[in-house]
Amino acid sequence: MESWSVGFDGDEDVERHSGMRDAPAAGPALHLTLVSDYICPWCYVGLARLEKLRDEFDVTLVACAFELRPGIPPEGIARDEYSKGRTYPPGYIDNLIQTARDAGIDMKRPPLIPNTRLAHQATEFASKNGGDLWAVHRALFHAYFEAEEDIGDTDVVVRACGGAGVDPDALRAALDDGRYAEEVQCQMTWSRTNGISGVPTTIFNGRFAVVGAQDFDLFRDVAGRIARGDVAAT
């Protein structure tokens, strides 16, 4: 698969590169593979922008797990402890919160940074059992960034996904026995193997990777060119 990646304004250019293994096969409609993590605020913003494509395209969503902070223990880590010695550019947090607000998100900075493996396993459960991935993604992001809940906790994950239409009892059983732990690990390995080091990364029709929570107009432009066949197959 050949991929085209773009970053945020001011970022270093991301080169067009080849050598990535194929993402899941794309159908005739617009097929998005969203590589993201639930503790990434820009992933939540990106999801909100991508959702708007559904007004213009027949979109199929596939989730691919990514662990932004793989060293976080199962019980999570306090933000104050994790943030010691870390700084942000002036205005970064205010800009993030305002950008999220513009996307309809009441973004907060939860006091706990959770381990997200259970949340990713819940997403995989939903994917394998006919769940609405848009709703599940939004429910888990909302639980963390807006309700400030610990999405490393089974009860929180089950409640959030249950509100998105997932069978809570079946989900709890799957989380308790680690049914999707190996698949989630495979997805994380796939992402790293294919050079994905930042999220969100959105792969359009298995061929073009757009990095970052880009403006909706850019997402729509890429989707439109692919739908029209303006981009030659490789």
Model-derived features: where do they sit?
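C-terminal cap of thioredoxin/glutaredoxin-like
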Residues: 2-59, 63, 124, 128-131, ...
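Structural alpha/beta surface segment adjacent to cysteine/selenocysteine redox centers
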Residues: 44-145
